[in-house]
């Protein structure tokens, strides 16, 4: 009997490998950060070879550290930063350009051009996404247009595109398998999530040859086996894949319509399961595929907040007013409130429900009495306010009122933030015992495909709560604070656009 399932969690700032046992408990974990490349303002890249190097490295390391044989691994599940775009040469396996990361804004002008062609409504109605630089489609076009010879090679069928899951599976199988899953495909802005196929009209508008695209499969299925050289001769089935947020929804056991979770990572991502219903948002949310499993797909509504944990990194690395992310909880509690200060961390624009590529960060409400602690507290509070923005939009779209919010991700360990979140939402916030739900979701998807776990009911029974944060704030106080947030956001919207007009 095989004892473990390995999750490869390829994130925005690090690659991790986590081993789970049958109970869904973490046995071992290994992590390695990699380089963030910022060639110009608003541009973000990663080196695809470094993504593969760090990811394969931690996978081997986690086995070696625990002296576990690769033969004991029942399956590998992959979860990944979504939308990040890699184009590589089919014959050499070498990328033709760096990975263009989901946060990168370089293709805003391509999006504007598509809008003038009248593509925005078509894209929203068929891919569930808003026309934005965030998604893979325009990033592929940028690579084909700007890398010498890329367009010609693509037309000859010599280039392949993949999101990070595809790139890892391609490398794990030494180029034998070029696939993605429904959840990742639904983030490319090229996939028709009603018809479940690549959309010819969008491909034509972006001049992307279909031959570049991976085959789309269920999120829980055996895609292929690890190449002999990867894990010392072991043929481990690669049996699950899902974009990080959909994987977290699965790992949290949100299998029923109306169940939702928020992941507090670099960005913040809130998803609500809408079952087999494609719910078209009227409030700037995305409609996305949650997963494909057991021969059918399920949909979700998603609100993306671009900057959450990244604003805490900014306090640490740029402002240098904290030494460690963990310090924020203690420092935020040193003051009774934010002293009227609001931080709007729109460093790369604003996501749902605003979708403003030209918004920029702002700190408002400063007085002479504003201290570092107030700015730290206001930064944490901004994460909770943005979550409320998204939740209100979700409830309006779906007609479902959330009873409680399941939370995970690094910042979910911050008790101050979780309590403030419950207060500002007026719903209980449930933090599970295992907060590594993204990796857990990938492990569950892979384990189900190979029979390591029987079905979703068995998985659901393993979810257990660690802490419930009950709302306790006075209604008037809560609404007063939230109104102030809305005023602060209005100061930050359209900032860059106005700046460009001034220059002209």
Curated annotation (Swiss-Prot):
One record GO biological process: glycerol metabolic process
UniProt xrefs under InterPro entries: ATPase_NBD, Carb_kinase_FGGY, Carb_kinase_FGGY_CS, FGGY_C, FGGY_N, Glycerol_kin
GO terms of molecular function: ATP binding; glycerol kinase activity
Catalysed conversion reaction: glycerol + ATP = sn-glycerol 3-phosphate + ADP + H(+)
Binding site for glycerol: 82-83, 134, 244-245
Record CDD domains: FGGY_EcGK_like
PROSITE patterns in the record: FGGY_KINASES_1 (PS00933), FGGY_KINASES_2 (PS00445)
Chain positions recorded as ADP binding sites: 12, 16, 266, 309, 410, 414
Pfam families listed in its UniProt record: FGGY_C, FGGY_N
Residues that hold sn-glycerol 3-phosphate according to the record: 12, 82-83, 134, 244
Entry binding sites for ATP: 12-14, 266, 309, 313, 410
Entry keyword Nucleotide-binding: yes
Inhibition and activation profile: Activated by phosphorylation and inhibited by fructose 1,6-bisphosphate (FBP).
GO cellular component: cytosol
Summary of the function given for this chain in its UniProt record: Key enzyme in the regulation of glycerol uptake and metabolism. Catalyzes the phosphorylation of glycerol to yield sn-glycerol 3-phosphate.
Subunit-structure text: Homotetramer and homodimer (in equilibrium).
Entry's family note: Belongs to the FGGY kinase family.
Record's protein name: Glycerol kinase
Species this protein is from: Alkaliphilus oremlandii (strain OhILAs) (Clostridium oremlandii (strain OhILAs))
Gene, per the UniProt record: glpK
